[in-house]
């Protein structure tokens, strides 16, 4: 059997991994991970918001809409709130002096972005099997060999080396961290990237 990795597209951009990790350490000194109340397996620090609207990054808006098969009925169900991704164009003032602002500026010049977030996957945890409305751009910041993303039953480890990936999150997928340290990725919604 030959595995097809076409849903994991490495981009022709690379950032300085040491600067990414430094920026992450700077941000967690001033901001904790947020998520919807009662959801223990999700944490986000939003780097962008709807201009002038700090409430646009709180609660379920940190996560956004997705579809899942939650039980044995096999019926797909929608979860969380629909997000107007294109409205999330303002880089949050508190983080403008970090390397993430440079990363945002470079990415924004190449892609039409929605929300840009730092996402946490805690040790020995996983997401649900779900699909999203659009592809995602990933820049792994901290990872370990036990971290994998699975798209349509194909698993891939994305190394923390400054590489930029676009993943086809419109297909069913999940991410898991089988290691014993946090997995940290910069994740952006990409509104103008099409997979075949």
Could you describe each region identified by the protein language model?
Residues 137-140, 164-166, 180-196:
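A short hydrophobic beta-strand segment most commonly corresponding to one strand
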Residues 1-103:
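Non-heme Fe(II)/2-oxoglutarate
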Residues 140-160:
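A short beta-strand-loop-beta hairpin characteristic of the jelly-roll/cupin
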Residues 120, 131-147:
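Short, conserved beta-strand element in jelly-roll/cupin
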Residues 127-130, 147-149, 158, 167-179:
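Short beta-strand His + acidic residue motifs that chelate non-heme Fe in jelly-roll/DSBH
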Residues 8-10, 134-136, 185:
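Intrinsic-disorder/low-complexity, polar/charged segments enriched in Ser/Thr/Lys/Arg/Asp/Glu/Gln
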Residues 114, 133-135, 182:
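Residues that flank catalytic or metal-binding motifs in active/ligand-binding sites
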Residues 102-123:
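A short glycine-rich, His/Asp/Glu-containing loop-to-beta-strand
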């Amino acid at each position: 059997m030959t595995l097809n990795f076409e849903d994991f597209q490495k981009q022709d951009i690379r950032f300085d991994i040491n600067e990414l990790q430094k920026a992450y350490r700077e941000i967690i000194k001033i901001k904790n991970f947020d998520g919807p109340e009662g959801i223990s397996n999700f944490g986000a620090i939003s780097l962008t918001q709807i201009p002038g609207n700090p409430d646009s990054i709180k609660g379920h808006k940190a996560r956004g809409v997705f579809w899942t098969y939650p039980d044995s009925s096999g019926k797909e169900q929608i979860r969380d709130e629909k997000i107007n991704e294109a409205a999330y164009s303002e880089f949050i003032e508190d983080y403008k002096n970090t390397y993430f602002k440079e990363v945002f500026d470079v990415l924004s010049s190449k892609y039409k972005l929605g929300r840009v977030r730092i996402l946490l996957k805690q040790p020995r945890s996983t997401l649900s099997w779900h699909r999203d409305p659009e592809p995602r751009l990933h820049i792994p910041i901290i990872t370990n060999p036990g971290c994998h993303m699975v798209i349509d039953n194909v698993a891939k480890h994305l190394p923390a080396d400054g590489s930029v990936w676009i993943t086809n999150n419109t297909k069913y997928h999940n991410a898991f961290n089988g290691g014993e340290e946090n997995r940290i990725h910069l994740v952006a919604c990409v509104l103008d990237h099409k997979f075949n």
